[in-house]
Amino acid sequence: MQAKIQAILQSREILGKEPRVYMQGYDIPELSARLFPVKTQNGLYLAVWSGEEKNVFERPSLVWREKDEVCAVYPFSFSNYLRLTRFLAHLKPSPFNHHPSFGCGDRLGMVSAAHLKALKEFPVFPVIAQQSPRELQKTRRSFADVLLGAAWGILESGYQGTFGADADHIKDEQDLLEARDLGYSMFTLDLSEKVNYRAFAMDERELSRRYEEMNAQEQEVFGRYRDKKFTLSLGVEVDLSEEKLLPLVLAYLPAVEQVEYWYHLLREELSSFDLEISLDEGESITSPEAHFFMAEELHRRGIDFRSIAPRFPGVFEKGIDYIGDREEFSRALWTQVAVARDIGGYRLSLHSGSDKFSIYPIFFRETGGLFHLKTSGTSWLQGVAVVAEKN
């Protein structure tokens, strides 16, 4: 094996300066080959040693024979990544397992191996590909780039477990379909622009007018929940009296219908995936009634979502601790936990979770360890700090 690695290192005139070969390599029995990830200043490569040249990967950058073996070096392109997943299935994203899940947004596309190293000591499911269209635009990357960076982090680290890929804060169909077709396993639907928050500011006269204008579907949904009250197992009250329910239906029913449409687009191609409902960037704190209505109505329509991100009180900025009253946060979280626990089948999600050290223990305790936590700002800021220090 050492001789193979030395032979690869001597090919620097093609691969570029300072090639780094990841020593563990990977056996591929189906090809009678051994594969080595190679990282250079020119890019990322796959070096494949075998008895004869294989036509499995595309566009070899370099091929040479060493005694009775052939080494072919291929660029680590997205098409070659897809081919590689036929032999290394753990490079394909998977839905959540039963553990709490932890999302690590790698905005630079360079630190997935470090994220995996940091998480491996803990019983959490790693979601190491996680970016939103907004972040992609700012960093000039694509969903394919993000997934490719995560896969390289797995090869680099030697990680053999499962991982998730989250198309985060999706707001339009084009982004959803792109991530779906690339093989993402998680889709976070951002409903901040789908909820009609103006309904909560309507006066009695306007609400009465909107009630008279309701279509048949709105009337049917309103009638199903009208004047119902629930006492949840944790003592939390959910009040769906008419005066509270009407603005709730007017505000959240369009979001429910949007989720239903997007869900069926995903189901057209995917048999298993994680769906997250994102309310955290909405205009108001998510009430237990809003959470209850969304979750109940989605389940009634057969939509199997895996997590929901309410908007909590306080300020959540990336890369700094929580700003707000921790007791108020704890009380609000308790009501959300009560709804999720009684309805069942999904976990609570905390967005902009980077460096929220003061509320991590609260979130873990109140959710009973069943949660999803999203981070992204910290690793990016640490990268900037390293560049500033070295350059």
Provide a role label for each language-model segment:
Residues D190-N196, A201-V259, E317:
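Active-site cores of enzymes that catalyze phosphoryl transfer or operate on phosphate-rich substrates
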